[in-house]
Regions:
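A short glycine-rich, hydrophobically flanked beta-strand micro-motif that places a catalytic Asp/Glu
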Residues: 47-51
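A cross-kingdom feature marking solvent-exposed beta-strand/loop segments within repeated
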Residues: 53-56
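Short, flexible turn/loop "capping" segments at secondary-structure junctions
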Residues: 2-8, 58-61
Length: 122
């Protein structure tokens, strides 16, 4: 299997403004998750998992929501969501754009981290 054909895992970190966690999650679940789910079903994505910290941490909380996506390969990661999927799930493109803009407005920070697996000795 060539390097290009290997799965690629990326962590997407979100630091949500205090008091807006529920609104952010509602928008994510309504607008972003269905797009990810459709791409899981199509095979572009191999796995999607979402996490929240269980505890408040040690006083330094860099993120409040994290999504880990495993793409089938680098090409899948570099492609954008198929516009046909977006149109089929969200015929009201203006509403989707407004709600996605609002979701981003609720953030203090957002960053993506592509991961390189470190093989542990056996």
């Amino acid at each position: 299997m060539s390097v290009a054909a290997k799965p690629v895992t990326v962590q997407y970190f979100y630091k949500i403004k205090w008091g807006f966690q529920e609104e952010f999650l509602a928008l994510f679940d309504r607008n972003h998750w269905p797009l990810l789910k459709a791409q899981l079903e199509s095979g572009r994505l191999l796995d999607v998992r979402a996490y929240e910290p269980r505890f408040h941490g040690d006083g330094r909380q860099d993120w409040t929501y994290e999504v880990t996506i495993t793409y089938k390969d680098w090409a899948a990661m570099e492609d954008h969501t198929d516009p046909a999927i977006v149109r089929s799930l969200y015929p009201d493109a203006e509403k989707l754009a407004r709600e996605e803009q609002r979701r981003m407005e609720l953030l203090e920070a957002h960053w993506d981290t592509p991961l390189e697996e470190h093989a542990l000795p056996r």
